Structures are given as C-alpha cells and as structure tokens.
C-alpha cells in the first residue's frame, strides 16, 4: 500500500517557468554557472547560490539561511506562486529518443520506514544530517526523489486521459529538452490516483537516496520536537516524482583505474585469466553485449572478458550484478581497490559515449586500464531492493535527471 498524496505546490509563474527551472547544480561547469547567474535573474540557481548577490561564496548554516531568504524574495516578487488546491502534477520530458511522463506528489516517510519505499544504495550519515539541517532551515523540497513503480493499467489510463488536456506549462530548455506539465486538481481524478497507488505493493527509489533519508531524519527530529504531533504535518512527507518502470532509462558507469597495482601487463592478464576467458579485440571500440561480459581497454587494445561461471559463486542478487562481479574478481583482489567510494585510484564515467572518453583517458596515460559494463536492469535493482541489499557505488546512471524549482513542496 503506497501512500501518495497531492499537495499545494509553489511553482513558477507561467511566463517565467523556462527561466526558473534549473538543472542540478553539479551539472553546471563554473563558466556555465557564472553565465546563468549573470544573465538570468529568474533562475532557481540564485536561490541555491545565495551569496552571488553579494559576490561572496557562503557555505554551511549561513548559506542555508540565505537560501531561505532568496526563496522568500522569489515569492515576494511573484516569480513563485502557490496553488490554492491540493494537486498532483503530471510532468513529461522529451529529448532525442527518450521520453517519460510521471507524477510529482508527496510520498510518505512512514512508507520509507516500513520499506514500502524500497532502497538499493547505502547512504552516508553525515550527509543525511547535513541535508536534514538544510531542509529544516529552508523549509522546502525543491529536488524530488525519483521513484519508479510496476506499470499499472489504471494509473496509465488516468495519465493518458490527462495528457489530452492543454498543459499548464510547455517549454523547451537550452539543452533541447521539451517539458510539459499538467495540474491535476479535480477531486475525482485526485482520488482515483490515490486509490490506484494504494493498490501498489512497493515504490522503488531510482535516484535520491540521500534526499529521502534526510527527509526521514527530519521527520524524526520534527516529531520529537513537536508535542502536538499528529502525523499530518508536512514534514511527514517529501516530494517525489513517480514514473512507471518501463519509462526509466538506465546507463552503466564504466570504471577506470590509475595503475595495475605493481603488475606488468602480462602479469595482470594472467591473473585475469583465472576468472575470465579473455579475447583480444584490437584497437576498434568494443562494448560488452550481455551480463557477465565485460570490455577492457589496456595499452591501446580492447579485450572481451567472459566470466568463468564455474569458478565464481552466485549466492544472492548482489553477487549477480556485474559491478559486484568486477569488484570481487578484479578491482579488489587484483588491483587492490577496496573502497569503491573513496579510493582516488578509481574513477567512473556514465554510459552513452563514455567508452570513447575511457579510451582517451587511458591513451593519454591518466589511467592504466578501463572497464566497460552493460547497464543494470530495473529487475536487478528491484531484486536488490526486495532482498534488503545495496549495490556497489556508481552502479547506475539513471534518467530522467529532474530540474529543480519546477514544483516546490513546503515543509
């Protein structure tokens, strides 16, 4: 039973929405960020970079307070407006050959605690605490947690009907992504959606594990500090974007390692031979085509690595993941990369055209070896989450990557 609720969103004025909604802060280069802040006074980036107003970089709790001040200024200047009715927000993204359509809504902290909302990544406690403090100070969610659910005919039919209507927003951003958003506030449709989601057994976090964990921590702190707690306070929920699992796009993260851990090329290949059947593919770009099959780039040549299944033990859903197999057979025992999150000798690059970058980095001598994997599937993610396990860091790069400031949930 997934509890999904409508909410009164704070959202951009219709004539400014294309200027307000921003990509994730980390996606901007320093040059891009400076350009947006200099020439676009409506960008949400002004809220999350509040020191720009004074030409001063601000961090920590001081920044949190200034973020809240900038948010209030956007409200005072009518850049942001508040909806009068609780609503769901249907949002469609189109780019190249990718398209998805889902719902902005308020999801339940109680569902997170009871594992109806399922996780597949570890979170870092200090980051949870820092972001919980941030949420407590700024009093809003602007970046939704991306979740997915098993395709459902009832939900799909409701969404299809709503998409026939004229959207509230329809705009294209400079990265050539087309955005459309519909406000669903009609009581009957809202109730139908709530009822349909209640019938779902689970929601799966695709992206935003720290955001959801921090919202859970904030709810615990707020409940403890509120003697009149009822369970209906806004802090008992957090903003999410829900899409059917058939519409999510998963890319791989390739791995590049700085050195061969003191081994020569021949010694390294001999050690690999214990776990893989190795074939030299020459200098033509070569990508793996199925699970348990890897592409390796070393010393100007590509190699295919086929796992020797008779020497590797499959014990659970985690052991079947290619990212885990590579860690257990190569990265850990041969290359001595034991901490996938913090070891400076390893770097990651997400799919699409990244195998070209991987080759270039090795050719330039920045890394000794690179490994390309096939993308993990949604079924594998669900198997990990259902078993209460967590995947190695950088196992998936997931689209859509959502814009900030399109809908805001006040806490």
Which residues make up each language-model segment?
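Surface-exposed, charge/polar-rich loops and edge strands
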Residues: 1-411
């Amino acid at each position: 039973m997934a509890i999904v609720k409508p909410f009164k969103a704070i959202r951009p004025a219709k004539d400014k929405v294309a200027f307000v909604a921003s990509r994730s802060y980390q996606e901007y280069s320093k040059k891009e960020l400076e350009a947006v802040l200099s020439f676009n006074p409506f960008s949400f980036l002004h809220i999350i970079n509040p020191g720009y107003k004074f030409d001063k970089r601000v961090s920590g709790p001081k920044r949190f307070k200034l973020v809240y001040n900038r948010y209030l200024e956007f409200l005072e200047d009518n850049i942001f407006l508040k909806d009068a009715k609780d609503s769901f927000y249907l949002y469609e993204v189109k780019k190249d050959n990718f398209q998805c359509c889902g719902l902005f809504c308020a999801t339940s902290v109680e569902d997170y605690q009871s594992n109806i909302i399922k996780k597949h990544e570890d979170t870092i406690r200090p980051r949870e605490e820092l972001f919980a403090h941030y949420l407590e100070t700024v009093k809003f969610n602007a970046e939704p947690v991306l979740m997915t659910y098993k395709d459902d005919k009832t939900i799909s039919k409701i969404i299809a009907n709503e998409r026939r209507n004229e959207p509230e927003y329809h705009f294209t951003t400079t990265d050539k992504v087309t955005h459309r958003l519909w406000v669903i506030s009609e009581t009957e449709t809202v109730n139908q959606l709530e009822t349909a989601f209640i019938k779902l057994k689970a929601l799966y976090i695709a992206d935003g594990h720290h955001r959801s964990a921090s919202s859970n921590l904030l709810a615990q702190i707020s409940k403890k500090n509120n003697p009149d707690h009822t369970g209906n306070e806004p802090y008992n929920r957090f903003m999410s974007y829900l899409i059917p699992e058939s519409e999510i796009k998963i890319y791989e993260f390739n791995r590049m390692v700085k050195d061969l851990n003191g081994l020569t090329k021949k010694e390294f290949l001999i050690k690999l031979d214990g776990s893989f059947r190795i074939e030299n593919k020459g200098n033509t770009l070569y990508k793996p085509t199925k699970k348990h099959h890897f592409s390796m780039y070393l010393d100007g040549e590509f190699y295919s690595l086929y796992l020797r299944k008779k020497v590797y033990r499959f014990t659970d859903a985690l052991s079947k993941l290619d990212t885990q197999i590579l860690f257990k057979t190569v990265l850990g025992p041969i290359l001595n990369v034991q901490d996938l999150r913090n070891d400076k000798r390893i770097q990651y690059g997400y799919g699409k055209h990244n195998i070209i970058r991987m080759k270039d980095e090795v050719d330039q001598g920045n890394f000794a070896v690179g490994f390309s994997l096939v993308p993990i599937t949604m079924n594998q993610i669900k198997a990990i989450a259902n078993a209460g396990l967590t995947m190695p860091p950088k196992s998936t790069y997931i689209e859509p990557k959502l814009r900030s400031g399109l809908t805001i949930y006040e806490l």
